[in-house]
């Protein structure tokens, strides 16, 4: 069994990344895992700036390059200090995938992708009220295009607790998670392969 210290959950807005991260944290107890994401730093911004970004999809007041550098810098520091981390993100561009791979290539995480039907994402987004439908749709259309994963899970009709219950044994019981290397290889070949397992 590998000594897993980093799990990356990738998926569009509304697919249940944060909910799964919290369920995994509880499922891994007594081993402690931290949950970290871009939102961790974005919610440090002034409320008016955050509201403009989330409610109006206007990111002009946010230095996204600086936020990205800081997110990965903080994440590397947490890992280097010995923490186990569940990191969730949305990858909407090839550049975003490259930044992730470059920043975290030495940590070889388990990669998990969450998917969901558009109808359910739309329902969740409206219920949450903290994202625009436009942003959710963009994530729905682009998620899965840029990163190979070890596990791909449809959350449309499954609770985060149910998913965590089935996913944790797979993570701790596997001797190898190679999606990270396949993702690095993909940068050269330009082809995205299928996940090794769909729990």
Language model features with spans:
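Walker A/P-loop
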Residues: 18
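Conserved phosphate-donor/acceptor-positioning beta-strand/loop module used by diverse small-molecule
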Residues: 105-124, 153
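Glycine-rich phosphate-binding loop used to anchor ATP phosphates in small-molecule kinases
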Residues: 62-108, 115
